[in-house]
Structure formats: structure tokens, C-alpha cells
Amino acid sequence: TARSRGLGDVYKRQPLMTKNDFKVIKNGNMDNSQTCLAIGPGTGLGFSVLRYVGNVPYVYPTELGNARSYNDHLSNLFEIDNCENFIVLEDYLSGTGIKKIYAEKSGQNLTTEEIVSGYLDDDLAKFILNNFVVALNNILQDLALTFNAKGGIFFAGSLMRTISEMNSINYIKEEFNKHSSKAHSNILKDISINLINKEHTPLYGNLNYSVIRRLHE
């Protein structure tokens, strides 16, 4: 998708970005020669896999947001009984998903911004956002192991920039490395998780996409 493509192309190798545009959430490796993942929960859920081959950037956009295998886990996590409006992953893990979950549980149609800004005072907002981070952590653990993402994981978008300032983000710092297998725990420990601070990330990504296309043609 264009959203996933934009996320992918904006990664660290993007010439319009500097080191100051990144914030480390969890320490680990950032090796350009290894597979990297970019994820951005916003209107939907963008997810791209990034890899350099022979000094040329390859971006693989995905349709992760339309996956369904996590539905049971997420409906239990968010305590949603009526799942009629929760069909795919991005119905839970996106800004739109946060709105839908809040409306389903309260009957109130607040904006994502209103829900996020109520984190400290609204118990339901806190419940949803805390579990949003739990769900994101669980899924990123699986994705990190699936793709062996030794180059790091990168969050993008205004929603993640805001959540990264909340106490809920500590769950990822404390839990991401945990696995029943010590060997796989060590793999997770070596994977860094980073936040892209730069605004309008998909715009920058799509601008760079045309450059990458020309390199391949």
C-alpha cells in the first residue's frame, strides 16, 4: 500500500533525515546491512520491511493491517464482546481503531486526539492506550522474529510520537525482550526500537520512493 511504502522509504537512509529525527525507545542494534521494520499506526496500519542489497534500498510494503490472525487475542485484550466492526488488525491497532474501541465500550464518539489527551484522567482511555501498547509489543515480537529484524524497528506517525511520551511505552521497554526461549530472548534483546520524530513521514517516504524506483530501473 502507499501508506506502507511511504513508511518504508522514510527510514534512516532517507537523505532528507538526520540522526536528530530519531529517538531510541529500546536499545539494540541499528545495522543497515540487516532487515529493518517500519510500522505506523494512523488512519490504518502501515507496515514495511526494508533491506539494502548491494547498497541499493529495497522496500517491501505489506498488507499487515488487513491480517486477521490476531483478532481473538485482541478482542480478549480489549474486552470487546461484539466484534462485528472489528474484522482486521487495523480495526484495533490504528488511530481509527482506538476511536472504534472507545465508541464500542462507551457509546461515545470521541476523536483519537481527545482519547489520547484524556490518558491521565479518563480510565477507559488509559485502559485502551495501555493495551494498545501491549498488543503492539506482542505483535512486534512476532514480526521481529519472523523477519529476523536485526536492523531495528522504527515507529512513525503522530500517534506513536504522542504515545512514546506516555508511561504506557515503558511496557515495550520492559517486555519486548522476554521469550520462553533464551536464544530467542537474546535475538529480541539485540533488536533496537526507535521512533521517527519527523512529521509528515509518508510524504517524505513517497518523495523518496521515486528515487528508489529509478535506481531499480
Predicted regions: what is each one?
Residues 62-82:
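A short, charged helix-loop
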Residues 1-11:
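Single conserved hydrophobic/aromatic residue that forms the stacking wall/gate
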Residues 12-34:
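A gly/proline- and charged-residue-enriched helix-loop-helix capping module
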Residues 18-20, 54-64:
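A short alpha->loop->secondary-structure connector
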Residues 36-40, 45-51:
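Short beta-strand scaffold segments in enzyme catalytic cores
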Residues 9-12, 45-49, 56:
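Short, well-ordered, mixed-charge alpha-helical segments that flank or form enzyme active sites
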Residues 1, 41-43, 157-159:
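Short, well-ordered beta-to-alpha junction loops that form the rim of enzyme active sites
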Residues 26, 49, 75-217:
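ATP-binding/phosphotransfer module of carbohydrate and carboxylate kinases, centering on a glycine-rich
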